[in-house]
Curated annotation (Swiss-Prot):
It comes from Caulobacter sp. (strain K31). It catalyses: (1S,2R)-1-C-(indol-3-yl)glycerol 3-phosphate + L-serine = D-glyceraldehyde 3-phosphate + L-tryptophan + H2O. The alpha subunit is responsible for the aldol cleavage of indoleglycerol phosphate to indole and glyceraldehyde 3-phosphate. The keyword Lyase applies. This is Tryptophan synthase alpha chain. The lineage of its organism: Bacteria, Pseudomonadati, Pseudomonadota, Alphaproteobacteria, Caulobacterales.
């Protein structure tokens, strides 16, 4: 069962008393070969889990950085199947690092839930985050994913109240993704003082690790979140590096892995500073 990789990784992180570093990049940005090159380098750069976006024409939860990445991914010809092919390519050399696909419902719906889940499991996908699928409508997708051992990871936000929270975390597995700021990705900054009580509340409600994202751009912000959460997710800051390097005809893989390494070091040392 593929989601076991997620469970094993968080168990190992807990044993090491450190938070995980979760990276996000968009498939096909700027092209498939570069995405695969970055994917293969991320674990050595310090990524504990990897989120791989699949491009969609209307990414409503994303800020300008990820929207542009989705446009570049679509322009390069990236599809949902192409994204699965990238995961399969990554798995040829890495059987341990969990990979979570992140995107929107429409491409998965068009593929068919059972067909998608089977193909995702075969490729080596461990989890799925669907931004625009409310829990009330997620039953058939969850059934298909559970049959293949893939985690459906749900999003909780500062606006998720006590009445709604049980519905959000029901049938969630792997971890809970806490959206630390209201609004779209990569625009506002996460506030660790607000994050700590939210993480405690989500852990209690779900019994699962809590990863925090949507507002972590700097090593200092990543470290602050890593002190209180089970994982810190960084996306826009890495995608910015990809965009800038591609525009300047620089080595995209080299630049983004260097940035990932800086962030990973901050996450890994965060709790040591408290000791």
């Amino acid at each position: 069962m593929t989601k076991d990789r997620i469970d094993r990784r968080f168990a190992a992180l807990k044993a090491e008393n450190r938070a995980g570093f979760v990276t996000y990049i968009m498939a096909g940005d700027p092209d498939a070969a570069t995405t695969l090159s970055v994917l293969k380098g991320l674990p050595a750069a310090g990524a504990d889990l990897i989120e791989l976006g699949f491009p969609f024409s209307d990414p409503m939860a994303e800020g300008p950085t990820i929207q542009r990445a989705a446009q570049r991914g679509l322009k390069s010809g990236m599809t949902l199947q192409g994204t699965l092919d990238l995961v399969a390519g990554f798995r040829e050399g890495d059987a341990d690092t969990p990979i979570i696909l992140m995107g929107y419902l429409n491409p998965v719906l068009n593929r068919g839930f059972e067909s998608f889940a089977a193909a995702a499991a075969k490729a080596g996908v461990d989890g799925l985050i669907i931004v625009d699928c409310p829990p009330e409508e997620a039953g058939p997708l969850t059934d298909a994913l559970e049959a293949e051992g893939i985690a459906l990871i749900r999003l909780a936000a500062p606006t998720t109240d006590d009445k709604r929270l049980p519905m959000v975390v029901r049938r969630t597995s792997g971890f809970v993704y806490y959206v630390s700021v209201a609004g779209v990705t990569g625009v506002k900054s996460a506030d660790a003082a607000d994050v700590a009580p939210a993480v405690a509340r989500l852990r209690k409600a779900s019994g699962l690790p809590v990863a925090v994202g949507f507002g972590i751009r700097t090593p200092a912000q990543a470290a602050a979140v890593a002190r209180v959460a089970d994982a810190a997710v960084v996306g826009s800051a890495l995608v910015d590096e990809i965009e800038a390097a591609a525009q300047l005809n620089e080595n995209v893989t080299e630049k983004v892995l260097l940035k990932a390494s800086e962030l990973a070091k901050a996450v890994r040392s965060a709790r040591l500073e408290l000791a």
